[in-house]
Amino acid sequence: MKFSALLPVFFLLLAVIDYCQAFAFLAAIPSILSALGKRDVKTQKYVDIKRRDLDLDDMLSKLFED
């Protein structure tokens, strides 16, 4: 597919996105999607604890291997 064939699709997509910005719930979709991928303080705390527990379990298993 040629790049020149995709150009009208790109402009149509821009027009649709611009039109959707008028609706509050559609305008919130990009921010919601970006927030899904971010770590917040609450979840990061549990990730760190889990990682420390795995490191501790690994260390204890190496100590008691003998």
Swiss-Prot record:
GO cellular component: extracellular region
Keyword Signal: yes
Residues where Leucine amide is found: 36
Cellular compartments annotated: Secreted
Propeptide: 37-66
Recorded superkingdom: Eukaryota
Signal sequence bounds: 1-22
Tissues expressing this chain: Expressed by the venom gland.
Keywords, in A-Z order: Amidation, Antimicrobial, Cleavage on pair of basic residues, Secreted, Signal
Role noted for this protein: Probable antimicrobial peptide. Has no inhibitory activity against herpes simplex virus type 1 (HSV-1).
Family, per entry: Belongs to the non-disulfide-bridged peptide (NDBP) superfamily. Short antimicrobial peptide (group 4) family.
Protein name (Swiss-Prot/TrEMBL): Antimicrobial peptide Eval967
